[in-house]
Amino acid sequence: NDSSVSRLFFNSRIEAISSGKRRVTAWIENNNFLDGFDPRGNDLTKSNEAGVDLLQTAFTGLDIKNRFTLKSHNTRSSISRLRDRSMSGWWNDIQFQLRFNRSSDVNIGLMIGAESGIQQNNEFSVNACGIKIVNKILYKDTGRFQTEISFVTAKENDDSSFIPPEAVNGYPIGNSFRSNTTLHYFVSRSISMVFSLNTIDDSRYNNFITFQGEVRAHF
């Protein structure tokens, strides 16, 4: 426990890429994060991830994307043992991208995953599955509109009332609905506006809505 260190982050990543008609990317990533802002002590988080990305053109106008990930997570705290947690699991996200023309496409995705581990000295095991739809529209050279909607159901198998926030890609027990809408509009070559609207409705956040607007100038 070094009280003189407030925050320390270390990341390493190795990638291997195969290009062609079928593009494959494999990676291994390691993250170590020390959070010492709390005067009571430090939290040390270690996470490891290995995965494969696959991009395949089925035929003109249809691409298939698949990401499979294996991951592990471990948090140890000198503040309280109740903050300690460890878990491992997997997540798979497959998307079918339909391109209608150069300015519009739709992604329809299926997500499934599982995670198990220990939190507060209790074991947990959770399965999750859901769908995701992403729509992108380009308006000439002046704007871009994108909407993403996801619905995921997570089920806990060991009667735990909650799971760690890192489990199954951050989805809590029960039904989760999330949406993200972004509008990027270029007023001129040097000025642009970005608006984003996010919504979350699940067991952690009840009808949570955030809105953000930006005006960007490039000189």
State where each predicted segment sits.
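Exposed, low-structure sequence patches enriched in small/polar residues
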Residues: 1-219
